[in-house]
Amino acid sequence: MNKLRFWFNNARPISLPQSMLPALTAVALSYSRADGAQFSWLAAIASLFGVMLLHLGMNLLDDWFDYKKGSAQAREQVANEGFRGRMVKYPYLTSGEATPKQLLGAVGGFLAFAAVMGAVVILVRGWMILGWVAATLILGVSYSGALSSLVSGD
């Protein structure tokens, strides 16, 4: 349980409103349009947990990409120029509390459980959800600059 709490806290749960509010809005709109006839609480709850797990996993993946890019030095430079901000994005890596390999394991865990939630939604609602999931994953990985790094060779 301590490992789960460790990774949950380092996945920056403070950022969850960014993804959970739109997801909750979608559930509320779906419920109001369904008149109770075709609304599935199972799909709604699985969707909400899936969004949360995906967001946390992508936050950790972003840390991994930043760690690999060496963004700590860039943050120090910005601070030296007088700008304020969060100086250490991944203190659990720089302090030695976790290794990059453990971080990737945590990312895999969050994304695997998100995939299970997605499978529940697919079973209830059909395969069309996969397009949304694929788009979300592409955007999430792109946010970290991974795709642009792969294309440019950095």
Regions found by a protein language model. Name each.
Residues 90-154:
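Intramembrane alpha-helical segments
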Residues 10-31:
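The first (N-terminal) embedded transmembrane alpha-helix
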Residues 58-109:
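Aspartate-rich (DDxxD/NDxxD/DxxxD) Mg2+/diphosphate-binding motifs
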Residues 31-35, 63, 67-71, 123-127, ...:
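Transmembrane helix-loop junctions in multipass membrane proteins, especially transporters and channels
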Residues 5, 14-18, 42-46, 102-109, ...:
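Alpha-helical transmembrane segments of integral membrane proteins
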Residues 8, 22, 53-54, 110, ...:
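Hydrophobic residues within membrane-embedded alpha-helical segments of Major Facilitator Superfamily
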Residues 24-25, 29, 36-61, 131-141:
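Membrane-embedded alpha-helical segments that form the functional core of polytopic membrane enzymes
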